[in-house]
Regions:
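Non-heme di-metal
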Residues: 1-281
Length: 281
């Protein structure tokens, strides 16, 4: 038997590789439609309105916004090993193209980090002359669970992936399915509900844009999970940890939103054909 031909045709002496999957192109085109500038959002009305909000509301919003200051920087910093792992994985889609999509996602995360740094500086009034200094100040307001997830568990997972001790399946289970798909999902929806009255219009606009980006991030992570062919044990562990992830914000996120975000994991896995049982509300 001859060797498998890896190209579908030759054009001008160049080998044209067969298109193994439409998914990388799908996500790339989606990203192109979602571009926005975090520096263009006007936070002036928000800065004026912030001191006038009731104390309880400011405390709740500070917990969420400060948590995102910490978390968005962390997810931007620790995504590169995932792209490297995608290049070396055996996927249905072209591995190098899937790695490129991780790069596109990292650009999104960097944009989100800039937005929340602006909110921390211009609205919350966090002290510090640099993003790193303001992020250090934000840690005092973030919940212990958020700090543990994004400053301990995520960096540890990224290091294990970089060293080849953990696969892409475990990485996207934590990063895309739990941190983005549950923790971020719950925090963003709590913010959008709280700010539906227009009290902080610039913050709400920014969170809306971030939330739209995160939808494709989670979808991309789910696609990666499907293509890595995860074990039943990994999926069971993912489902078991969803509830814990939803509790990361504490009382800053209403119980109904926590419950809904946690159950989205089971729904996504079912829709993707990874599990046979639909989530029970």
């Amino acid at each position: 038997m001859g060797e498998q031909q890896l190209w579908e045709r030759v054009v001008g002496g160049h080998f044209v590789l067969a298109k193994r999957s439409f998914w990388p192109n799908f996500f790339s085109r989606l990203v192109a439609r979602l571009q926005w500038n975090p520096m263009a959002i006007d936070l002036t009305p928000d800065a004026r309105a912030w001191p006038e909000l009731p104390d309880d509301r400011r405390r709740r919003l500070t917990t969420l916004l400060a948590g995102f200051c910490v978390a968005e920087d962390a997810v931007a910093e620790h995504l590169t090993p995932f792209a490297d792992a995608a290049r070396g994985a055996k996927l249905a889609s072209q591995e190098s193209l899937m790695a490129w999509v991780f790069f596109l996602q990292r650009r999104d995360e960097q944009r989100h980090a800039k937005l929340f740094d602006r909110i921390g500086s211009e609205v919350l009034g966090l002290p510090g002359d640099t993003p790193a200094e303001r992020r250090a100040a934000a840690r005092a307001y973030a919940t212990p669970a958020v700090l543990e997830l994004f400053e301990e568990r995520l960096p540890a997972m990224a290091a294990e992936i970089a060293e080849g001790r953990t696969g892409l399946d475990e990485g996207v289970s934590l990063y895309h399915m739990l941190l983005e798909g549950v923790v971020f999902d719950a925090g963003q929806h709590a913010l959008l509900d709280d700010l539906a009255d227009g009290a902080l219009p610039g913050v709400r606009e920014g969170v809306e844009r971030v939330e739209r980006d995160e939808r494709w991030h989670v979808g991309f992570g789910l696609r990666c999970l499907v293509e890595t062919k995860p074990t039943a044990d990994l999926l069971d562990d993912l489902l078991a940890r969803a509830g814990e992830a939803a509790e990361a914000w504490g009382d800053a996120v209403p119980a109904a939103i926590r419950h809904e975000s946690a159950h989205k994991v089971a729904h996504r896995l079912h829709v993707a054909g990874l599990t046979a049982t639909r989530a029970v509300a």
